[in-house]
Design a protein with these regions (language model features):
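Alpha-helix boundary recognition
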Residues: 41-42, 86
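Short N-terminal helix-initiation segments at or just after the protein's N-terminus
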Residues: 7-15, 45-56, 90-95, 102-105
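Acidic-enriched, low-complexity/disordered segments with a strong bias for Aspartate over Glutamate
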Residues: 9, 22, 43, 51-56, ...
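Charged, gly/pro-rich active-site loop segments
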Residues: 57-130
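Short beta-strand segments
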Residues: 1-32, 40, 47-52, 61-62
Length: 130
């Protein structure tokens, strides 16, 4: 997933993150000292995309969303997100687990979703408001 946050100078900053979803709720994590975390502390608005690279432009599909990223503070929800991430990315389980203070977990609940499907027409998207 690529997530764009707003830098202090007003320019968007897009970065790739691992993510997991539970229904429409999306979780991702980052370092609390990262530029992403600093940007989110100042402005919680984000845009994100979930897609995959294809060689045929008419095969482009994906999701583009506008929403806000909220820090997850409740320890049980943090544990839930970490368990979901471990299920989605089992290779993570062989790595040393970070201490709670070494990670920041965020929750995203989409407000506006563009569903991209270029097989219908070049540039086609359906807009859904949640």
């Amino acid at each position: 997933m690529t997530i764009a946050t707003n830098r202090p100078d007003g320019w968007p900053r897009a970065t790739t993150v691992g993510y997991v979803n539970d229904g429409l709720t999306i979780y991702f994590l980052c370092s609390p000292q990262s530029q992403k975390a600093a940007n989110l502390a100042r402005d919680s608005r984000v845009s994100l995309t979930i897609d995959h690279d294809v060689s045929d432009p008419m095969a482009i599909t994906g999701l583009s969303m506008a929403t806000e990223a909220q820090p997850v503070i409740d320890p049980s929800e943090v544990a839930k997100a970490m368990n979901l991430l471990g299920t989605r990315y089992p290779e993570y389980m062989s790595l040393p687990m970070p201490k709670p203070e070494e990670i920041a977990v965020y929750r995203v609940l989409p407000k506006v979703i563009s569903i991209l499907d270029y097989s219908k027409e070049f540039g086609h998207s359906d807009l859904v408001t949640v």
